[in-house]
Amino acid sequence: MKDKEIKEEVLKEEINKEVNEKKKCECEEGKEEAHEHKNDEHACCGKHNHKEEIEKLKAEIEEWKNSFLRKQADFQNFTKRKEKEVDELKKFASEKIITQFLGSLDNFERAIESSSESKDFDSLLQGVEMIVRNLKDIMSSEDVEEIPTEGAFNPEYHHAVGVETSEDKKEDEIVKVLQKGYMMKGKVIRPAMVIVCKK
């Protein structure tokens, strides 16, 4: 092989080497300028542009984070508002029933005032009876009912405060009622205080 041919061969190898070097993708950090990008891919290697994807994901994460913080703040405000409403309800829960009882209080005061002027006991008695009926109507409107005290003693509804013998009553039957008991919507709010028969 002649010197000229050898030189040409070496030159071709050098050119091929240089072309291959240009085609080679240098993906290491700090060498991004060696990439030719096309449609978010490296023209040289077909790999995605990870930097853009990372920025996009960071933006999405930030958006989700802000959305979460807003919802958390909304929930905290909702909770505080509901707590305030519950406190208000507790504070004025008895307002309705108290308002109803005010009428009975007015009637009591009028009955006392009227009887003190006229000294008429019968009128006072009638006034008191009317007030008792009024109070029972109020209680009935709130589903409050008197606990029955006829027949056998029942510890769920009655509170025995004493025993005594009785020829008219059977063992464990109620002999006497010392204080009436009441239920509200089926729940005992005050048991009846009774005397029970023991033979």
Curated annotation (Swiss-Prot):
Subcellular location: Cytoplasm
The entry's keywords: Chaperone, Cytoplasm, Stress response
Primary location group: cytoplasm
Top-level taxon in the UniProt lineage: Bacteria
Gene Ontology molecular function: adenyl-nucleotide exchange factor activity; protein homodimerization activity; protein-folding chaperone binding; unfolded protein binding
CDD domains: GrpE
Any single biological process term in GO: protein folding
Any GO CC annotation of this UniProt entry: cytoplasm
Leader sequence segment: none
Disulfide bonds: none
PANTHER family: GRPE PROTEIN, GRPE PROTEIN HOMOLOG, MITOCHONDRIAL
Subunit and interaction comment: Homodimer.
Primary role: Participates actively in the response to hyperosmotic and heat shock by preventing the aggregation of stress-denatured proteins, in association with DnaK and GrpE. It is the nucleotide exchange factor for DnaK and may function as a thermosensor. Unfolded proteins bind initially to DnaJ; upon interaction with the DnaJ-bound protein, DnaK hydrolyzes its bound ATP, resulting in the formation of a stable complex. GrpE releases ADP from DnaK; ATP binding to DnaK triggers the release of the substrate protein, thus completing the reaction cycle.
Family: Belongs to the GrpE family.
Protein name from the UniProt record: Protein GrpE
Gene: grpE
